[in-house]
Amino acid sequence: LSGLVGTAIHYSGAFLSYPAVTFMDALMARFVLNGLTGLLVGFLVLGGIIVGFNLTVILNGWAILNALGMMFALALGIGVLNCYLFTRFPLWQRAWAILMRPMFILSGIFFIPENVPSRYIDAFMINPLPHLTSEMRRGVYATYDAVHVNSLYVYGIALGCMMLGMILLLRNHKELAEL
């Protein structure tokens, strides 16, 4: 989602030529459309598994909502910052794609953070993605206790990236539209 938001100005160049359309319109349209699409797909997959296999589950709705909130906030924050960086420095988009490959492995999808050795856990949890996956696990698995989740940390990173990206975009959006 952050990658799609990051390319909003590039792909909305024709719309940005209209005086009534701003870069914020392009960012928010891209975020809302792709965010709701991803949410619907996730709901259908999870719901389909539960109904298809006739599972009895105890879902923690607050933990799921918190995980989704962290995910959307982080995607928007990093997406807004990358929107500036991708447009201003085209090479950054390729570098970002290369850097994010190992981040997928280190996001806590294939293993749980509680199994990481104690001497590495602090370094591992610098990455905000394990916080998301652990919080979602807490919402789906009733017996899972997400000890290392720090929601404020994730929301803080998201807000910081969003603020920095907005400052850069507000200062340079006319220049970026010409690139």
Q: Which ranges hold each PLM region?
A:
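Short cytoplasmic-facing helical segments at TM-TM junctions of multi-pass membrane proteins
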Residues: 14-16, 62, 179
